[in-house]
Structures are given as structure tokens and as C-alpha cells.
């Protein structure tokens, strides 16, 4: 089974009148900004060029104890309960929290582990190659191609690739962000040891408080959501540690923490930032955040709003609607954009749905809770306490 490769005549702007189902059958060939994902993998210093075009049209969800994939053809208008097309159920998994594709189309799973609940799975980051993903229909429990375990990990949850291909991992348990170089991630696949010390241990001069969501904008600025602090920090690219002058560390616990001062702090205003979980940038550079607290909303802050410290009122607020007795947003966690500007939001609490909002639903602030264009919900989906989400290659 190989990745689905279809030619694309349009990117982000389908022909007027084209049905969403038809649009979703077209493969989006992602440009430089999409080489490392629309949900926070833009350039830091310079671009990391992939070896192949990266596609961005299948839905991948970190789902309790596994990872599931839904094909674009399954993301049809209305409410449905499709069974996952593929399931990745590696025996090493404890509690997958986040999913991210690198510039080569390999999948990285951020796993918080289950030690705290009495299990044996250590917190780790795992890589599964294109070849392994292509073979999931025959072997849905492959051993990871790369395993990164670190003495620093306590409960890693989300990650973003910068433009160099380095991985930035947020750890809500330790209130730190860890940076692993491409070379470190590659080396861990060729050595017997899976323990890797981060190149950088990033802290904030104004302490992180349960950092989860993490995303780069188009200029390489880094944004981190403080789930425990009801704030979002923004760090200018120029203030981030310069990885060009770093050498790979050899001490088990890595280097001393590097404190960085936030350039921007966005604070809660009337529930606008309430237990923020996921972060994602749209194609216009606007920042979207999911509120996993009582608000259960997904909100947008414009480029101008995130340029300065304050408590901005969201430009757009997507609240939960009720469809067939099911709430569409319940403690939303992961959010992500596909190549056409559609937004997916995952509910981590029952009924464990995935709400998909089309670009036309994201242009203006709705006067009432919008009904998602696409709503996946029901037992057949196998969704159970899902968390992270991303769009990536479709394997058919």
C-alpha cells in the first residue's frame, strides 16, 4: 500500500461550485510552508527541504492508545461514523498525545507514557516511516523506526518541526520545551541506545504553566499554549536559542535550561483563553487555539492581535453545536488545517467527535454555534479520548 498520489490543479482555492467531496478527493501538493505542516512547522533560520512532495489531505488522530487514519473520501459532508481506514497500534504505545509529519512524510508520535497510571510505557517520541505506514494494512503494530526517550521527559504532549527539521517538544509535566536536532533523531535509529538528551531545554522567564500547544508561524516565531495558566506565549524567532552554534550534547540530562523571555503574552478575557490546548496557524498567519476548559471553543486571533501583549477578544469563536444529540465540541484538544484551509478539531471528552469546519465557515465570526461541515462521531470511529490531530499522507 503506497501513499495516495493524485495530481492537483489547485491549492487552497478549488473551482467555484466544486463539492467538498470532490475537493477532498484532490491531492494538495504542499509548498514550502507545508513541507513541515500548516499546524506549526514553519521556518526557523532556514527551510528544511523534503525529498518528496508532502501531501496533506488525510486525517490522523492520536487516539487514547493508538493512532487512526481517516481517508479524505471518508470526510464527507454531514454527520457520519466511518471506521478508521488504518490503525497504528504499536505495542510500545502508552498514551499517544500528539502526531506530526516531518518533511519526508514520516509520522512522529508524541507519547506521554502510562507510568503514572501504573503502566510500563515510558514517555517517548516515536517515528514511523513512510514504508511502515504503507504497510499498516498488513502490520498495524510495527516497532518504531526511531525511539527517543529522555531523562527529561515527564509528560510530553505536542511537538512542532521548525524549518530545519528539528523537533520542538512541549512537556506539560516539566513545564519545559525540548529541542532535538535532526541529526540526533537520525542517530537514534542507528545506535542501541534510545536515550537521547535534548540539544536545548527551553524554559520561559515567565514560567510555563502546563505547556501543550506549540506552533511556529511563517516567520519562525514560536507560540506555546499554557494549559494551566490560561495564557499563550509568543517568542520572536530572533529570541530563540541559536541552534546553528550548538553542538550535540552528551550528558544524560542535556544542557542547563535556557530561559527565554516571551515577546508577547496573550491572556484570558471572558473565556477567550481557557485551558488552551492546541495551536495552529492558518494560511493567512492567524493563530487558532482550542479551549479545553469550560468554554469548549475554538478561537482565532488575527496576525495583528498576536503581535502585542494583551487580552484580545477573539476575531472568530467557534462554539459547540448539537447535532443528532451530540455536542460537536467537548473539551477540544488537537486542531489542525488541511491543504485546503479546512479546520479539524478533536473532542477529548464524550462523544469523542471530530468537527470539521470549511474555509467558508472560518471567514467571519458566527452569530451562533455553527454546525460543522463534517462531523465524525459514533462507536464505529473507535475514537476514545482522542487528543492530537494532524493532516498528512493518505495511504490507500
Task: Give the positions of each predicted feature.
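Short loop/turn segments immediately following the C-termini of beta-strands
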Residues: 64, 112-114, 120, 172-173, ...
